[in-house]
Amino acid sequence: MSAKKSYLKVWRGLAGAAGSCARVFSKKSLARRDRRDQLPFALFLFGLVGAVFQWFLYGNWLSGIVSEYTVAAFFGGFSIVLPILLIGFSIWLFRNPQKTHDNIRVSIGLFMFSSFSAAFLHFSAGFPYPSSGIRILSTAGGIIGWLVGLPLTTLPSYLAKTVCIIFIVLSVSVISKTPISKIVRVIFRYAKWLFNSDSVKTSPNSSVSSSSEHQELTGRDMPDTAGDNRHDETVTVLSGTSLTGSPVSEYHGESSDYALPSLDILNSYPPAKHDDAENEKVITALSGVLRQFSVNARFSGFSRGPTVTQYELELGEGVKVERIIALTKNISYAVASDKVSILSPIPGKSAIGIEIPNKKRELVALGSVLQSIHPDAHPMTVGLGKDSSGGFVLTNLTTMPHLLVAGATGSGKSSFVNSMITSILLRAHPSQVRLVLIDPKRVELAIYSGVPHLITPIVTDPKKASEVLQWVVKEMERRYDDLASFGFRHIDDFNLAVRAKKIASDSRELTPYPYLLVIVDELADLMLVAAKDVEESIVRITQLARASGIHIVLATQRPSVNVVTGLIKANVPSRLAFAVSSLVDSRVILDRPGAEKLVGQGDGLFLPISAGKPIRIQSSWVTENEILRVVEYVKSQAHPDYYVLEVQNQGNIDSHIGDDMPLLLKATELVINSQLGSTSMLQRKLRVGFAKAGRLMDLMESMGIVGPGQGSKAREVLVTPQDLDSTLARISASVSDSKLD
């Protein structure tokens, strides 16, 4: 008995020494009670013995016999690789004994990799049966290769091998916890480098995404039916923003070969390095709280996200969930954080989630999020960021169908809006998606001025914004008139029929309608100026516009009941809350607490239309330099095709122009070319008095050429020099029409 104990002691000592050697370069320290060195030491010895027989004694008759009747009998020719896998897996177990779920995952992945590799070799050797003898089996795929490949024998050999390769790639994804899309991109990249061929490439912004980590939260992608790639060669300025103007049809910019930007235009960042020692310290602190209050529960694992880590707590028998919730303040004290959130239960698990902010936050770059979107995905699909387990969060704006965003200063609301617009510019053609940007702050969205996706210059005047929203309502009604006339229920079906030339109109040429995305950066400013008109237009849009391809995103810093009214909330089903200052604000935006405990800088709670509970995300981040590069690129591809704003009383003013027509045309040319809406400039250049110059400026404002007066400041010019000729022609035509009337 003493000899047996001595052998066990020696075995444990050798296992401990091997484990210490394996952990010598590890950054984290491992307590002695947490070490599990005996199993990995046994695997290490098997791998070492296998390496000696398979590599160093290769060709020896004794080694051949031993190999044929052991590992080669099971795995065939793949047995020469097994020592590497066994030694590598043993080192992993030495260094990560407590990661139970990860260890099971890696074990399953390694077995899949070995089995399907053996099956591939078995098919390559002609798929011999066991009756052929052990010698032939050991040179093919062995017993394992035969068993795994047996269900595939009904397929042709090349298809069976393809299935094996697919499962091998899947096993690599399971082992490395790497999305399949990234593995495919690496394979393509090395294939292109190896063969130096242009035929092995992906599209400029391509990335094949099929990983289970990439969570498509809002349903399937819609087909790409909004817009076409056909353009006219000239820029056409249509008077589509008056409440009686023509409907929005597809883009007519001047570039017929518009190319989407490559995702390489965005910055690339190295992957974040996680320090598991920090998480182990938190688990130790949390376990101490449970022991202190005699709570029968244990931590089964954790999921580290970019901002917070979610620790999974499994309760013992007879322990109420309320006991854990009652310990929230004690947990906050133990981990020195006042931003602790408790999720009970974790969706799909019999466990409670305790979310604690990380000391070192991970940067979620927009480029990495967009890489996870399939290149054939819907053009309105945007990358929101990452969830609390590190998976990418994507959403299709058409399925939301409208979004309400709120957050205090510094919470990351404006960064999210920038990421969303940049996603659209990177993934959508101007013929597919048109934008209406309303920016009462005047500076938040000014960087996007002149992009070809804009349907009108960026609206900064709250009064003008009310008129724009009224125009959107009219545009929605026009689209519904077309849908009703031709018997369609959704704009996608109408566009498909137009492209297939299945429908036609006697009065006009039918063209596909693009999606129309309206973004209001600060709803509170609009509600202060024209609350009744703005609320009425927003409610009409949110109630009816989904089937017409019109969607709206409302952002505000003050989610009070005066800004986010009951009617607006009732018709905007999807919400995104960033950090707010009070529980009341959180209830206004989410109808529940939680947003007041967010840590800011992009930390948010996303509540899509299909979710019962909000999902914690870290919003994607895009720098100003990246936005500038994207904007400059899309502006170099095409010019904007504006629908110039016109007010309702334009006809009354035009009819009284009289002999001032030549002066008006000269004034228009001066203002557009100089991009300076100054009354004193008109006085000097045209040599007219103050009253005449002021009247000319009022006429130009009524025609949508300049914005409203801003005191002593120059007026904003709403028309670019590229649109000068068409604007002058429009003025002349409108005056001629008013005279004929």
UniProtKB/Swiss-Prot annotation:
List, alphabetically, the Gene3D superfamilies matched: 3.30.980.40, P-loop containing nucleotide triphosphate hydrolases, Winged helix-like DNA-binding domain superfamily/Winged helix DNA-binding domain
The transmembrane segments are 39-59, 74-94, 108-128, 136-156, 163-183
An example Gene Ontology molecular-function term: ATP hydrolysis activity
The organism's place on the tree of life at top rank: Bacteria
Q: Which residues lie on this side of the membrane: Cytoplasmic?
A: 184-741
- Compositional bias, Basic and acidic residues, is annotated for 213-232
Which InterPro entries has this protein been placed in?
AAA+_ATPase, FtsK/SpoIIIE/SftA, FtsK_alpha, FtsK_dom, Ftsk_gamma, P-loop_NTPase, WH-like_DNA-bd_sf, WH_DNA-bd_sf
A single Gene Ontology biological process assigned to it is: cell division
Instruction: Report the PROSITE patterns cross-referenced here.
Output: FTSK
Q: What segment(s) does the record annotate as region Disordered? A: 200-232
SUPFAM superfamilies referenced in this protein's UniProt entry, alphabetically: P-loop containing nucleoside triphosphate hydrolases, Winged helix' DNA-binding domain
Record-listed ATP binding positions: G410, S411, G412, K413, S414, S415
| Protein location | Cell membrane
Residues in FtsK domain copies: 390-587
Which Gene Ontology cellular component terms are annotated?
A: plasma membrane
What is the membrane topology noted in the UniProt record heading this document?
Multi-pass membrane protein
Assigned keywords, A-Z? ATP-binding, Cell cycle, Cell division, Cell membrane, Chromosome partition, DNA-binding, Membrane, Nucleotide-binding, Transmembrane, Transmembrane helix
Q: Ranges of Low complexity compositional bias?
A: 200-212
- Give the family, as the similarity comment puts it: Belongs to the FtsK/SpoIIIE/SftA family.
Functional summary from the UniProt entry: Essential cell division protein that coordinates cell division and chromosome segregation. The N-terminus is involved in assembly of the cell-division machinery. The C-terminus functions as a DNA motor that moves dsDNA in an ATP-dependent manner towards the dif recombination site, which is located within the replication terminus region. Required for activation of the Xer recombinase, allowing activation of chromosome unlinking by recombination.
Entry text on domains = Consists of an N-terminal domain, which is sufficient for the localization to the septal ring and is required for cell division, followed by a linker domain, and a C-terminal domain, which forms the translocation motor involved in chromosome segregation. The C-terminal domain can be further subdivided into alpha, beta and gamma subdomains. The alpha and beta subdomains form the DNA pump, and the gamma subdomain is a regulatory subdomain.
Q: How does it assemble?
A: Homohexamer. Forms a ring that surrounds DNA.
The name on file for this protein is DNA translocase FtsK
Provenance organism: Tropheryma whipplei (strain Twist) (Whipple's bacillus)
